[in-house]
Amino acid sequence: MASPAAIDLAVVYEHPTWFEPLFQALDRRGVAYQRLPLAELTWDPAASPPPAPVVLSRVAMSSFLRDPEHPIFFAQALFEHWQGQGARVINASALPIDSSKARQLSLIARLGMKGPETRVVHRQANLVRAAEGLRFPVLVKADIGGSGSGIVRYDDVETLAAAARLGSAPVGVNGVSLVQEYAPRRDGEIIRVETLRGRFLYALRVESPGETFDLCPADACLARPGAAALTMTRFEPPPAIVYQVERLVQAASVEIGSVEYLIDDRDGSARIYDINGLSNFVADPLSVLGFDPHETLVDWLVEEIDRTRKQGAAA
């Protein structure tokens, strides 16, 4: 890392180990950057200038699983503050869509794409009414999720009603829940399409045993005790899917992220069910992909640093 006086890039993050491959790639390229763990930050709304001309957001929605004092909403306000002072905050624009599965599904529908049949509630008492017209089994999901958390399957209306009475169904840290038809994954797999700059980067076929909802493909996820045994292979989605994914991330203002979809085994349709504003990239990328996407990301970061520097000189 560079000295504070020579910083071109600040990387703002929450997880202590996920971004070591990125930091190593930045070191190899000689980028003048600073690591900024969110847990250590405070800021003054009347001051607190940006730490660098370019800031990279690496905020994970799953942060609430690791600390009840999570930084999700803190980071949104901080990034807007820095943007107001002229900083280029990469992927700050992704936080509103990343922090709400309801917003994601609304956007998917507005663009004419297919997601799982879903209803949105903010009170447990409304769960059964929301499920009317949906086929069981249903899933209840927290609106803000991550790493497959906050998802419970209910096979019939009686078990859903019992959960509602107990107040035990999942709810997001924002107080919002989704009631969603369970769409069985064809061949037990999902497809995760990674994007950069609003364009296709690569895709993975992720296969898992059983009905786990934790399908995170990165090293740090796979190493967790109790994590699902996943099989990941590079995959080339049909051009029509790539087109939909690119439209979706561009409309969502996701500069770096991914989209997940499955083939619904009931009718063979592709259903997009998740937009991720944070990508850890695949474990062992050279073996799985034949290239390291961290290097591609750093190429773009260097371009953004140069572009921002030129804009500053011309101002």
Set out the residue ranges of the language-model regions:
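Short glycine-rich anion-binding loops that position phosphate/pyrophosphate groups of nucleotides
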Residues: 60-64, 144-145, 278
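Short hydrophobic segments within beta-strands
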Residues: 10-12, 196
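A long amphipathic alpha-helix within ATP-dependent nucleotide-binding catalytic cores
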Residues: 214-269, 296-314
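Active-site nucleotide/adenylate-binding loops and adjacent lid/helix of ATP-dependent enzymes
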Residues: 2, 10, 48, 79-85, ...
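Protein kinase-like catalytic core scaffold
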Residues: 138, 201-202, 257, 271-274
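Glycine-rich phosphate/pyrophosphate-binding beta-alpha loops
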Residues: 147, 276-288
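Phosphate-binding site of ATP-dependent enzymes
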Residues: 152-249
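Conserved N-proximal alpha/beta basic substrate-recognition cap immediately N-terminal to
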Residues: 14-117
